[in-house]
Amino acid sequence: MADQLTEEQIAEFKEAFSLFDKDGDGTITTKELGTVMRSLGQNPTEAELQDMINEVDADGNGTIDFPEFLTMMARKMKDTDSEEEIREAFRVFDKDGNGFISAAELRHVMTNLGEKLTDEEVDEMIREADVDGDGQVNYEEFVNMMTNK
């Protein structure tokens, strides 16, 4: 399944993986997964975290390595019920709930994830997604960005 991913997608997932893999040991533990999810405003229980790991933990060692992470991401991309997931992700970014993601909101979430971006990088991300050129990302633009990769 992961063999249907492009080089670019794999590179992006590698970056995402390293955000989760806080200690850089090449695996994601339930603790690391919990840290990232909480920084995104979610509040998963220990059991939920364990379930999420078990779902993709092919070798059963209790952690997720990069190949397992890739499989999980490939599966998620194929999921058609991702509409709700995308809406949820949009809500995470849209802090004030006004239906738009501003550069400040994007910077805030990325910083919470431990991804320190320069103002230029944040502006570039907004520009890439901002089809109508109003300087912020609305839901439709966000959906396009998430699904057209």
Curated annotation (Swiss-Prot):
N6,N6,N6-trimethyllysine modifications at: 116
All copies of the EF-hand domain together span 8-43, 44-79, 81-116, 117-149
UniProt GO cellular component terms: cytoplasm
Which terms does the UniProt entry file under GO BP?
microtubule cytoskeleton organization
Say yes or no: keyword Acetylation present. Answer: yes
Q: What SUPFAM superfamilies does the database record attribute to this sequence?
A: EF-hand
Q: Which GO terms describe its molecular function?
A: calcium ion binding; enzyme regulator activity
- What keywords are annotated for this sequence in UniProt? Acetylation, Calcium, Metal-binding, Methylation, Repeat
**Which residues, by range, are in coiled-coil regions?**
none
Residues modified to N-acetylalanine: 2
Q: Can you tell me which residues bind Ca(2+) 1?
A: 21, 23, 25, 27, 32
Looking up InterPro entries in the UniProt record yields: CALM/Myosin/TropC-like, EF-hand-dom_pair, EF_Hand_1_Ca_BS, EF_hand_dom
- PROSITE patterns, per database record: EF_HAND_1, EF_HAND_2
Lineage top rank: taxon: Eukaryota
The family annotation for this protein states: Belongs to the calmodulin family.
PANTHER family given in the database record: CALMODULIN LIKE 3, MYOSIN LIGHT CHAIN 1, 3
Q: What does this protein do?
A: Calmodulin mediates the control of a large number of enzymes, ion channels and other proteins by Ca(2+). Among the enzymes to be stimulated by the calmodulin-Ca(2+) complex are a number of protein kinases and phosphatases.
Q: What else is known?
A: This protein has four functional calcium-binding sites.
Name of this protein: Calmodulin
